[in-house]
Amino acid sequence: VDNMVPEKQKLFQAXNGIPVHLF
């Protein structure tokens, strides 16, 4: 499941345009 976490982080980071290190 850990593999899915970084992918979502990148998606959020690209969509929001902000660094999502909290997630």
Curated annotation (Swiss-Prot):
Keywords, sorted A to Z: Membrane, Mitochondrion, Mitochondrion inner membrane, Oxidoreductase, Transmembrane, Transmembrane helix
Membrane topology: Single-pass membrane protein
Cleavable signal peptide: none
Gene3D superfamilies linked: Cytochrome c oxidase, subunit VIIa
One Pfam family cited in the UniProt record for this chain: COX7a
Pathway involvement of the protein, from the record: Energy metabolism; oxidative phosphorylation
Any single Gene Ontology cellular-component annotation: respiratory chain complex IV
Stated role: Component of the cytochrome c oxidase, the last enzyme in the mitochondrial electron transport chain which drives oxidative phosphorylation. The respiratory chain contains 3 multisubunit complexes succinate dehydrogenase (complex II, CII), ubiquinol-cytochrome c oxidoreductase (cytochrome b-c1 complex, complex III, CIII) and cytochrome c oxidase (complex IV, CIV), that cooperate to transfer electrons derived from NADH and succinate to molecular oxygen, creating an electrochemical gradient over the inner membrane that drives transmembrane transport and the ATP synthase.
Family named by the database record: Belongs to the cytochrome c oxidase VIIa family.
Self-association and partners: Component of the cytochrome c oxidase (complex IV, CIV), a multisubunit enzyme composed of 14 subunits. The complex is composed of a catalytic core of 3 subunits MT-CO1, MT-CO2 and MT-CO3, encoded in the mitochondrial DNA, and 11 supernumerary subunits COX4I, COX5A, COX5B, COX6A, COX6B, COX6C, COX7A, COX7B, COX7C, COX8 and NDUFA4, which are encoded in the nuclear genome.
Name of protein: Cytochrome c oxidase subunit 7A-liver, mitochondrial
Organism: Oncorhynchus mykiss (Rainbow trout)
Lineage: Eukaryota, Metazoa, Chordata, Craniata, Vertebrata
